[in-house]
């Protein structure tokens, strides 16, 4: 049977915008892998950081305000910079059905600019999802306060938002884990969120999930989570679900969610285990939740391995936190010393350019 080739025009157009130094680093890592139908855009007030990303489409904001030198820890400069570049940003967003915005909250550019860009994106009619990190405790209370204030503004401007607190990394690392690997583990969570959704929509599957399905779950949904789990052997589907919904890097649990999209990915899927996975998901979400299911093949998985992705949203203010989440991880069930294992389709990089390094460490490096 001849292989069907799907023209690019049939895919939902997805744009991923990395804002500030942290957001730029994240999309730089994403850009190294292949994502069908995804366009990357880097936005920054810092010209040096902007060019380090290697992203083809770059938008330098705040030329008259920050003179290309960044925004420090002043979100007002980031906000003004985005306002100044509104026309250019609108043009870049135009035509997208779905926009992911990613940034490290707590600084100036990412925190200040992301609500403005989110508002522009929503005005175009695009489904707008923010995927952000919160700073480490050791970065100080002022940076945390800036992040919380920025998040409060952001959540009013997007359809859904996913938050990864940097401090959660201490749940899966030991004292010998290199700094580079620790930051990569955080970046990978954000990468999985974008890549997982993009592939779900744009890669034809056994049971297809289309853009309208994703929109049903995420439009005006507020706080959301995405979890990806892998497992092999007996009860692999059940174990993959457990891993997906209890990652120690994710702050919340899908318990009580009113909108759930989950996908089962493997090369030898069995109907019984798909049913088991579906039951596991349905038991923890709201009884009246909208549950959308997809299944697809992925020959990058190891033989006998299964991968499950769960997107949950619509908590209606009733959020359960993953306080005991150390038991499972999308990275590894048991973290080996000096090594973080990541899924086989992600190759760890150790370049300092891929890190969201706290400001005080960047200054020391200079």
What are these model-derived regions, one by one?
Residues 1-366:
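Tubulin/FtsZ superfamily GTPase core signature
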């Amino acid at each position: 049977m001849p292989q069907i080739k799907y023209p690019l025009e049939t895919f939902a157009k997805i744009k991923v915008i990395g804002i500030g130094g942290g957001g730029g680093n994240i999309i730089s890592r994403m850009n190294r892998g292949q994502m069908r139908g995804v366009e990357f855009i880097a936005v920054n007030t810092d010209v040096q950081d902007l060019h380090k990303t290697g992203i083809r489409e770059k938008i330098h904001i705040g030329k008259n305000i920050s003179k290309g030198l960044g925004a420090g820890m002043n979100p007002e400069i980031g906000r003004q910079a985005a306002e100044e570049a509104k026309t250019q940003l609108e043009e870049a967003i135009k035509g997208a059905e779905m926009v992911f915005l990613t940034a490290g909250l707590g600084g100036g550019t990412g925190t200040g600019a992301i609500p403005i860009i989110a508002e522009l994106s929503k005005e175009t009619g695009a489904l707008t999802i923010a995927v952000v990190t919160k700073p480490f405790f050791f970065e100080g209370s002022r940076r945390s306060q800036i992040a919380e204030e920025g998040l409060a503004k952001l959540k009013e401007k997007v359809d859904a938002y996913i938050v990864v607190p940097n401090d959660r990394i201490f749940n899966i690392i030991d004292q010998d884990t290199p700094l580079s690997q620790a930051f990569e583990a955080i970046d990978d969570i954000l990468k999985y969120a974008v890549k997982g959704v993009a592939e779900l929509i744009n890669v034809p599957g056994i049971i297809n999930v289309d853009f309208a399905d994703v929109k049903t779950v995420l439009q005006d949904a507020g706080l959301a989570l995405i979890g990806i789990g892998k497992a092999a052997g007996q009860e692999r589907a059940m174990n993959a679900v457990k891993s997906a919904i209890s990652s120690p890097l994710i702050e919340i649990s899908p318990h009580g969610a009113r909108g759930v999209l989950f996908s089962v990915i493997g090369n030898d899927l069995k109907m019984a285990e798909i049913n088991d996975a579906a039951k596991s998901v349905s038991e923890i979400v709201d009884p009246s939740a909208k549950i959308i299911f997809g299944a697809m093949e992925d020959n990058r998985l190891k033989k006998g391995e299964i991968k499950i992705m769960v997107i949950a949203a619509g908590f209606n203010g009733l959020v359960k936190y993953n306080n005991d989440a150390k038991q499972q991880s999308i990275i590894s069930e048991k973290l080996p010393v000096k090594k973080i294992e990541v899924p086989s389709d992600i190759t760890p990089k150790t370049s300092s350019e891929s890190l969201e390094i706290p400001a005080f460490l960047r200054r020391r490096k200079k």
